[in-house]
From Swiss-Prot:
InterPro entries: IGPD_sf, ImidazoleglycerolP_deHydtase, ImidazoleglycerP_deHydtase_CS, Ribosomal_Su5_D2-typ_SF. PROSITE patterns: IGP_DEHYDRATASE_1, IGP_DEHYDRATASE_2. PANTHER family: IMIDAZOLEGLYCEROL-PHOSPHATE DEHYDRATASE, IMIDAZOLEGLYCEROL-PHOSPHATE DEHYDRATASE HIS7. It is an enzyme of class 4 (lyase). Keywords: Amino-acid biosynthesis, Cytoplasm, Histidine biosynthesis, Lyase. The lineage of its organism: Bacteria, Thermotogati, Deinococcota, Deinococci, Thermales. It catalyses: D-erythro-1-(imidazol-4-yl)glycerol 3-phosphate = 3-(imidazol-4-yl)-2-oxopropyl phosphate + H2O. Belongs to the imidazoleglycerol-phosphate dehydratase family. This is Imidazoleglycerol-phosphate dehydratase. It comes from Thermus thermophilus (strain ATCC BAA-163 / DSM 7039 / HB27).
Length: 194
């Protein structure tokens, strides 16, 4: 079974995260930031993963550190759980609508970290539970850099912060589910490694 547990501790945050790509789904999520918990549960449900997260951060300062470090821990766990990449689908894309919002996520479990996401171009109004689309960028940057994947996220329509962030997590979850499936033999690269 492809699974990993990571722990990350800094002067600003503490994160313990368990990710399972196969087998049972679900798991308890408690970060101390209810909206982040809600988003991680979207990732868990729509990605069909086992995802358990316990985290604490300096929320009295800002949500930035906690959101970013949970993304880093998720990336670390994803990289470890994927192992050598044998049999992976590797590439995936997913759309996620939520009322007026439509988001597209395209990713490649390439071993090459790159995030293509420009929140300054998104016409989003406000934030949801202290989290906005700039915090989403920090979460994704942590995931991409430590999970070593290429990720493109596009907002096709929408302005309401809650819907934009939630649709982004749902699209990410669906794309990750597809890309992490084992559908073949060997490493899906002409180089022989990811």
């Amino acid at each position: 079974m492809r699974e990993a547990t990571v722990e990350r501790a800094t002067a600003e945050t503490w994160v313990r995260l368990r990710l399972g790509l196969d087998g049972p789904t679900g798991g308890k999520v408690d970060t101390g930031l209810p909206f982040l918990d809600h988003m991680l549960l979207q990732l868990q449900r729509h990605g069909r993963f086992l995802l358990e997260v316990e985290a604490r951060g300096d929320l009295e300062v800002d949500v930035h550190h906690l959101v970013e470090d949970v993304g880093i821990a998720l990336g670390m766990a994803l990289k470890e759980a994927l192992g050598d990449g044998v049999g992976l689908e590797r590439y995936a894309e997913a759309f996620a609508p939520m009322d007026e919002t439509l988001v597209l996520c395209v990713l490649d479990l390439s071993g090459r970290p790159h995030l293509e996401f420009r929140p300054e171009a998104w016409p989003v109004v406000g934030e949801a539970g202290g989290v906005n689309h700039y915090h989403l960028r920090e979460f994704l940057r942590g995931l991409v850099n430590h999970g070593r994947l290429t990720l493109h996220l596009r907002l096709l329509s929408g302005r309401e912060a809650h819907h934009v962030v939630e649709a982004s997590f749902k699209a990410l979850a669906r794309a990750l589910h597809k890309a992490t499936r084992r559908t073949g033999e060997g490493v899906p690269s002409t180089k022989g490694v990811l």
